[in-house]
Amino acid sequence: MATIGYFGDSFCAGREPESWCVLLANRLKANIVHWGEPGRSIWSTFFSFERVKHFDRIPDYSVFCWTEPYRLYHKELILSANTERLPHVNPKIYDALDDYWVYLHDYKKDELAYTYSLKHFDNQILSSVKDKTRIVQTWSFRPFETAGRHPNIQLSSGEFIDESMFNFAKSNQGSKSEQAILPDWNNTGLINHMTIEQNQHWADKVYERLSS
């Protein structure tokens, strides 16, 4: 049986039957071997794919949903601005995070590092495995859109859907609902931050690229 892996954040983490990830896998007759990790940075995505590559477990289909640049990497914790403190975690970690955002953080540095690292991953890593896996790349968040900027980053390995899933969900495209979806991130009625109709629409969109 074919395999498919989703690499990214919470926009490709939903395991419900109505999730676009599950719908797409069913249409491809593929077993899901990797899921997105909610709240994680692009560095978590890089490390996840490097692990499957190292152990020669690259799936037949690899779908990447790239998140925003403003998340810090930690191998166990979600760390970004306004991260909720967990009671079992050493509070010094969150104190250090708060200090980082106040005294050390630089948006331009984040954006430059994001652009360079993502292009390197696209041009050097993914291009080297494109004969082993069908690749689709898209945006969970279009780069820097949460900061009000929209640089033109083009990705060349595999199929590139140059659309923001965040914006797709927020604008209610493909949904019967009349109310805005985001930024109600904790709405339990949503899957991958989208309605059931939107999940179906997104599964169709990705399937069309993979079947073309």
Regions found by a protein language model. Give the residues of each.
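Serine-esterase "nucleophile elbow" of acetyl-processing enzymes
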Residues: 1-46, 54, 195, 201
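Alpha-helical cap/lid subdomain in secreted, periplasmic
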Residues: 50-200, 204-212
